[in-house]
Each structure stands twice: as structure tokens, then as C-alpha cells.
Amino acid sequence: MESKEHKGLSRRALFSATAGSAILAGTVGPAALSLGAAGLATPARAATGADGSVAPGKLDDYYGFWSSGQTGEMRILGIPSMRELMRVPVFNRCSATGWGQTNESIRIHQRTMTEKTKKQLAANGKKIHDNGDLHHVHMSFTDGKYDGRYLFMNDKANTRVARVRCDVMKTDAILEIPNAKGIHGMRPQKWPRSNYVFCNGEDEAPLVNDGSTMTDVATYVNIFTAVDADKWEVAWQVKVSGNLDNCDADYEGKWAFSTSYNSEMGMTLEEMTKSEMDHVVVFNIAEIEKAIKAGQYEEINGVKVVDGRKEAKSLFTRYIPIANNPHGCNMAPDRKHLCVAGKLSPTVTVLDVTKFDALFYDNAEPRSAVVAEPELGLGPLHTAFDGRGNAYTSLFLDSQVVKWNIDEAIRAYAGEKINPIKDKLDVQYQPGHLKTVMGETLDAANDWLVCLCKFSKDRFLNVGPLKPENDQLIDISGDKMVLVHDGPTFAEPHDAIAVSPSILPNIRSVWDRKDPLWAETRKQAEADEVDIDEWTEAVIRDGNKVRVYMTSVAPSFSQPSFTVKEGDEVTVIVTNLDEIDDLTHGFTMGNHGVAMEVGPQQTSSVTFVAANPGVYWYYCQWFCHALHMEMRGRMFVEPKGA
């Protein structure tokens, strides 16, 4: 392997640096202080160009689907206006909609929950997690292009992934992934369609995590997971060497790839940054599928697992050395090149995926797949692409976005005297993910780039110690990038995608009465001989369990009142029979911590205990009618023994 001087940050620099201060001379490698490739383009001050505004009553050109990090929800924005259009609760408990409290949402949370998780939650008085750390949102693909069926997202906090239906923009499935810990990187298969969603386990732990070997790091392992995107269950898993960070997939359906910043399997920051080189893991999908089909796997916690660690010398994986603590892993729309950001190295490594067959079947030297390694600046994290062969990489430490040309970087790596860097733009501040419109598909556009900055500092009015993030809109239609908008966002978007509305023609404004979301609720109603598709006001008592069926048509509930006994478990089932767009109802039970959304033609239900005797008003918390305030009724709770 070619020997190259390591030009990243020293370990001392890493420990002494803070995100809020620049890393100056003496704390960076010599490349950053020389007139190397990274220094040839003069950074431009962020300038104001076309403002990207959308007039009242006009629609945005694109949907933006945002993660929210520790808030646990998905957000929908309009691009270029950057107006927030909707929040879709996923892993979080949502007070507005009742997500995480309605019976329908609890079933989705619990469907794949492990017994260990149920035990942990029960010990803390819970049925489900009420938090999540949602980093990445990606859409399903067909033939390398978005197909508008599903959106997928991860939960790093509780080792889960979720699926949102694009026709109603509601979560329809959550999967807890066994054996792995801390699902971070997550990408759908691009070709021929998203049969799989690939998920990276970031955190190291024993596979048999029962406390018997918890101090023996030699028993720790990381897991790469393929989730069946249609069945929403684990298809197979691969043991790997090192940990897993971000991932992506190719445009032929042959490969998936993941970065690893902890090839050392270190347990401390110093140990994790010790090596000059880490790696990218390449997964051979066909070989893994062949082994699974032939029964050549071990079953661990009900999952089929193959061994792709280095010492296994299998055809499942190959490891390509990359400097240093690599992070972003982004496949270009040219179908050929994978860009891996160095994070602690000022470089992005460009891999030619057409050379991967030789790594597996011809014993080619791992770095033979490297075709470019441009020096771009300090702290490269992620790369986005336009449709003209250009790449855009975020530089966390430099607080910049750098535009560079992939073909010219390859020519420079081969020895040609050419500078692939086309432009640099200051952003505010410390950028992480960035995305062009449709840039992770074969339909990459050339108009807008969104850069998600981790710090806003002085860009907005001071709102206290916790500041908003800053999502910046950048015009990339010309030769130079132009900053056109600052967008404050609540904690903490990590990633986003931008999608043409033409891909989403089937978004509904009114629910289908046969929707599977409330199928189990309908089954219970049928057992109770209640028709929830018609006006109903039934009350069913089953011991100390009471089911109250009611219909809502603005501005009234079919049940002006109902009576239960102290200590009863009460389930209220509400069906909104209005068929008008945007006529959402709600049901809130006063002084019981109960509230839920009931969209037009939707059925929703919620269960609670009526613990105290007395009169309690329920009401519609959505403003659905001029007589909205009058849309209410009483629950009478009779004292025990009355």
C-alpha cells in the first residue's frame, strides 16, 4: 500500500479543541498551514443573493424531510422557503397528536419490542420509550430514484428504525433491532428497489449482553443489519471488525458500505483516535444472501447472523483503509464513485465501486479502489452532489462548504496539475450534513443546497443558553455558491433530503375508512357489535373495562356524556366522520393527561384509568368549527360502592 504522510489533526489538538473556537496554528497538521490544494481557493464571505422566498398562497418547489435528533420526530419543510409544514412524531411522545398514547401508536411501538426492553420499561413504569434520537431520514427507491412509498429513519438512542407511510405522512412501523447497539448510519438499498434498509450498529457490546463478559472487550462486536423494507423485520446481520458509523448503497444492488471511526475497538476517546488509519467496510450483498439461503449462518436472538470480521476471511466483507476516523459515506449519482469524508484528515477519499469485484475475487490490494483523495479543508464530514459532476463537502472545523469536481479530483490524483476545488463558502457555524435536491438519487438537481449547521451563536435573537441550530439554504445554480437563507431549528436536525412533489402525487387529505392503522380497533368494535363507520354512541362494559364508542362531526360528539365507575379502565374510541380536507378533530379528557388527534375519516382510541370520582369534561382541542368551544361533553365517574 502506498505510504502517505498523515495530515489530519493530532490527538492533542483534538483534545484541546472546542466546537466554539477555531483550531489555530500548532494544532493542525502541516497541510492546513501550507498552500496545498485546500488553500488554493479563497473562501467567499456568505453573500445574499435571490432570497428563495415563496409568496403567500404559492407553493414550494420541493418537499424537505428533516430529522430532529433528540426530539425524535420527522419534520417536513418547504424548499426554498424553508417554512416548516408539519412535524411527524416517530419515536417521541407527542402531546398534540397523542402519538405514544393512543392505542394505535402504542401497538406500533410494541410490535417488535424485545422482552428485555419490556422489562426495562416496566421497571420504570412505562409501556414504551418516550424518546428517540432520530438522525437520518431517507426515502425508498426504485431503480436508483425516489419512489414516494416510504420514508425510513433511525433511533440511535434505543436501537430502532422506523417507517413512515408517504400517503398519510404517519409512522406505520417501528422495529427494535436485536444484537446491535446504537443504530446510527441508515440507508435504503437503491437498486433495483429498496428491498433492504441497511443499518449500522455504532456501539460495541457483547452479543450475549447478560453482564457475564461486560469487562472483557474481546467479546464485544458490532453488527451490520439488513432490514426487510416491506415486512419490516430483520432479514440478516453481519458481524464486523471495528464499529460502524455512516453507510450508503450503490446503484447496482451489489454493495453496501459503512465507515468505521473505531477500528481500534477502543473504549475511550484517546483509544478511538489512536490509529492513523481506520476503514470502510464493503458488504457483498449477493454473497451474504447466498450464505443465508444455504443455511450457513448462526442464529442469535432469532436473527440469522454471518461473520464478516477480518479474521473470518469470508466473501461477505472487505476493509479499505481510510484516514482518519472517517465519517460521511456518500454515493455519487454518477453510479461509480463513493466519497468518504476523513473527519480528522483534511481529505475526502474517492472510491471506484467498479473496482470492488477485484477486492473480493481477485485478491486486489484494498487501496487499489482509491481513485482520488483531494485535500479540502479541516473537518470534512459529509458530501452532497449536483447533476454536473460536482461534490459539496461540509468542513466542520473551517465552518465552510467546499465545492469540488469529482472528475478533476481523479485527474489530480493521477498526477495532472489541476485544482478540483471550485469554490468555498463560509457557513454559520460548524456544518454537519448537507444535501442537494435529489442529490442521493440519479435525479440530482442543480439549484439548491441545504447545509445543516450545528451552531448558530450570533445569527438570531438570543433565546437563552440553548440556541437554535441553523439550517442554511444555498443557491448552487451558478459557478459560485450563494447563501440565501438562515433557518433556525429546534434541537437537533442531523440530516435532510429534498424531494420533488411529482414523486408524491398520492398524499391523501382524508383518511380511507379501511386504513390498517386502526384494524385492531375495528376488530374489537366488531366483537362488540358496534359499527364504527356509522353514527354511534355505544358504551360496552366488560368487568372493570369500559369501551366508549363515539362519533364526531363538527361541532359535536355523538356522546354528550357517559358514566363509568371509580377505578374503571376506560377506552374511548372516536371516529371523525367529517370528509372535509383539513377538518381534524381531537379528543382531550380534562385532568387525565389524555389527548389525541382524530383526522377526517380516522378512528383513534385511547385508554386510561378513571381513578377519581367526579365530573370531567372532554372536548375537541382542534379548532374545527366556529362552535369549537361548545364541542364538549362530560364523563361521570361514580364513587366505588355508589
UniProtKB/Swiss-Prot annotation:
Record-listed Cu cation Z3 binding positions: H136, H433
Cofactor binding note: Binds 2 calcium ions per subunit. Binds 6 Cu cations per subunit. Each subunit contains 2 copper centers; Cu(A) (binuclear) and Cu(Z) (tetranuclear). Cu(Z) is thought to be the site of nitrous oxide reduction.
GO molecular function list: calcium ion binding; copper ion binding; cytochrome-c oxidase activity; nitrous-oxide reductase activity
Primary localization: periplasm
Known EC number: 1.7.2.4
Binding site for Ca(2+) 1: K454, E469
Subunit architecture: Homodimer.
Family that this chain belongs to: Belongs to the NosZ family.
Protein name in the entry: Nitrous-oxide reductase
Organism: Achromobacter cycloclastes
